[in-house]
């Protein structure tokens, strides 16, 4: 990245604040005005981010399924997960992310999509997680989702990447897959992921990022921005522990300028305001929380200065 482009990247939010003097982006990404509830009109006004490699726009908050959707064959729990999916879709969400690593989550997502008749609403994101036969695992994943073409398949935690990444590229070239990605989490193998980003034509990467875990800010996010790679954020709440530790603490005074009602929304706005971030994927078992998370993809976003304030306040409290 050139010095000019790096300065542009790092200062993009701050420039808006300097022009407006408000400390927030307004009215939001793509220049639309945003509301907080879930009517059809407001779903159309949700903040969207662009996938650089294709120009497609997707809602700026998605839905993860790690642990929360691993409920086995319990029909009551499956229906609860379907209720979460319904709330998510009704609030304007699209991307749902899973993995063969997540137990029964893939089956539960497939169950929910069948029950809701929502296959035309979902941006389907899953992973290949094997050092063995990746094609066989992908076929099984497709059966579990009951879906013929995924919007995104990712090499999970770089496992078997020398075999699995070429497999995904071949699928994309044959029209069997729309986007290719690679994931990591917990800050592991960041250097290995960066090497792949430099040498392969990826559509997506997925990494851990939140106001406490900020390692990717130093190099990986600028690299993704420079190379036109979309970025999915896992563990935005540190598996829920970050929000739990903030529970009971009052929101900072400046949060009212962002129209947020919870720490979860403040964290998500911190993330989606970053110019390289495409879509955080918080997981939940509660429909109300799915709606709350999607509401973070509405209204004004923090500028660079306010993002630093958010990180500083949370850093002190946790």
Give, region by region, the residue ranges found by the protein language model.
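N-terminal binding-site loop/beta-alpha segment at the start of enzyme catalytic domains
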Residues: 2-120
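Conserved, mostly hydrophobic/aromatic
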Residues: 51, 63, 96, 109, ...
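Structural motif corresponding to the early beta-alpha repeats
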Residues: 100, 116-135
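Glycine/proline-rich, positively charged
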Residues: 129-215, 219, 225-232, 273
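Short loop/turn motifs at secondary-structure junctions
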Residues: 57, 89-95, 118, 146-149, ...
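Hydrophobic packing residues within well-ordered alpha-helices of enzyme cores
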Residues: 109-112, 168, 193-196, 290-293
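Active-site-proximal loop/turn and secondary-structure-junction residues that shape catalytic pockets
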Residues: 67, 100-102, 128-130, 159, ...
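Structured C-terminal cap/extension of enzyme domains
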Residues: 12-20, 24-25, 39, 51, ...
């Amino acid at each position: 990245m050139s010095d000019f482009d790096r300065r542009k990247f790092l200062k993009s939010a701050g420039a808006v604040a300097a022009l407006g003097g408000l400390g927030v982006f307004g009215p939001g990404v793509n220049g639309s005005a945003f509301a907080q509830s879930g009517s059809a009109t407001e779903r159309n006004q949700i903040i969207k981010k662009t996938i650089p490699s294709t120009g497609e726009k997707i809602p700026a908050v998605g839905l993860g399924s790690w642990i929360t959707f691993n409920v086995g064959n319990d029909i009551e729990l499956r229906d609860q997960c379907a209720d979460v999916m319904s709330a998510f879709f009704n609030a304007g969400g699209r991307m749902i992310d899973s993995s063969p690593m997540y137990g029964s989550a893939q089956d539960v997502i497939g169950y929910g999509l069948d029950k809701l008749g929502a296959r035309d609403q979902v941006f389907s994101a899953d992973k290949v997680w094997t050092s063995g036969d990746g094609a066989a695992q992908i076929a099984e994943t497709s059966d579990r989702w009951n879906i013929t073409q995924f919007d995104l398949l990712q090499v999970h935690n770089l496992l078997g990447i020398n075999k699995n990444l070429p497999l995904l590229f071949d699928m994309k070239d044959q029209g069997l897959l729309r986007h290719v990605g690679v994931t990591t989490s917990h800050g592991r193998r960041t250097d290995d992921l960066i090497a792949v980003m430099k040498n392969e034509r990826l559509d997506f990467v997925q990494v851990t990022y939140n106001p406490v875990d900020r390692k990717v800010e130093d190099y990986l996010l600028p690299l993704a921005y420079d190379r036109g790679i979309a970025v999915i954020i896992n563990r935005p709440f540190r598996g829920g522990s970050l929000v739990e530790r903030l529970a009971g603490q009052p929101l900072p005074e400046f949060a009212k300028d962002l129209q947020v009602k919870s720490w979860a929304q403040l964290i998500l706005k911190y993330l989606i305001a970053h110019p390289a971030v495409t879509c955080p994927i918080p997981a939940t078992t509660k429909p109300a929380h799915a709606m709350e998370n999607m509401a973070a993809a509405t209204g004004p976003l923090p500028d660079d200065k306010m993002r630093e304030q958010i990180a500083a306040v949370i850093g002190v409290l946790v």
